[in-house]
């Protein structure tokens, strides 16, 4: 069966898009955020409050079942007016004695600007350790003699929504929470301003909405010892409390109001350039400043430095350098016309040839010593050896007439004396042939004309 309706098809796979009940609830199935619970601008909170004992919004305070919605609204309205006075009394008592004696809340304003009429009224007794009968209007809602003392290491967490927890053992634990909306809307009272100036670190600015353990602003993970008689709340193990030494005891998100200002003196320790008193600032441009920390004649110091460096260099060069005449250069370095002497050969035939050539005065011609000993034809062949070797590839047609040694010897063996002697001795018994010499000269001249231009 083909389904053509896109809402039916996509609704089966994406139930949260079409409001169907699936594994994930739709956004509109949750209760909307009740802004009136957290605003104290004089609106009647009891009429607009939708929080009940069974269903509540994710950000509404969780109250005991014995406190009704109207009572919760009244307590929330009166808590802001009572926060400053209660925290001031608690701070004074905590700084003077070990435990807060009489943690009662007294002298509070009425609901929505009404008369005081004894809302949450009790007297503060500086020596006792009991919380007086906390009443709402004329009917006592929460009462009981409590042996629950607040230790001085907890340093009065100032929150402003009164969470009154009833207990069968009649231990009463009272917190006051102040939310972010009240911090932004309502100005601080004079007592709260005096409290900020005191040495006690008060933790405001914390919202009761972030109640999840993994929320980033969940700073106060309170451990309420309700079952222990006379147990101290807070202490060093409390995440949001301050330790007995005065420092923060591990609070992650709670920021103290009066942090000591970081005062860093500029000239302390002589670390600054301008703070030393000797520096001279010279502004080269708007973004370039030259600090001179030397007091004296700068020009003379620079001259002395460079003169000392130059003298040091000259002294080293005098010790290490030597004149050119003392160095071991070959004689040809000094005389460009110098001819290197011919070393004495070891072969007996070559020694005879060189000796004959030296006597006849042909020392500069390498081919003359051979020709002077061999004969006229050998002399003609060796005298033109360079030209014949250059053009021997074009003289292949005259190979039967010109039996030159260079055509039959390799380039490397051509200069070897033994092979040259063997080739020369081959022609030494031939008579002089004038026509052959003329033909050789004619071929060489024609080769010059062909390739040299």
From Swiss-Prot:
Residues 178-193 have a biased composition (Basic and acidic residues). InterPro entries: TDU_repeat (IPR006627), Vg_fam (IPR011520). Pfam families: Vg_Tdu. One of its GO terms (molecular function) is DNA binding. Residues 151-177 have a biased composition (Basic residues). Keywords: Activator, Cell cycle, Developmental protein, DNA replication, DNA-binding, Nucleus, Transcription, Transcription regulation. Expressed in the developing wing primordia initially along the D/V wing boundary, and by the late third larval instar, maximal expression is seen in cells at the D/V wing disk boundary. Less expression is seen in cells located farther from this boundary. GO terms for cellular component: nucleus. Residues 145-279 are annotated as: Disordered. Residues 279-335 are annotated as: Ser-rich sd binding domain. It comes from the Eukaryota. It is found in: Nucleus. Residues 227-253, 267-278 have a biased composition (Gly residues). One of its GO terms (biological process) is haltere development. The Ser-rich protein domain within the C-terminal region interacts with the C-terminus of sd to form a complex which acts as a selector for wing development. Interacts with Dhfr. Loss of vestigial function selectively eliminates wing and haltere formation. Involved in determining which thoracic imaginal disk cells will form wings and halteres, perhaps by interacting with other nuclear regulatory proteins. When in combination with scalloped (sd), it acts as a transcriptional activation complex that regulates gene expression in the wing. Binding to sd switches the DNA target selectivity of sd. Required and sufficient for cell proliferation at the dorsal/ventral (D/V) boundary of the wing imaginal disk. Also required for cell proliferation in the wing imaginal disk, mediated via activation of E2f. This is Protein vestigial. It comes from Drosophila melanogaster. The gene is vg.
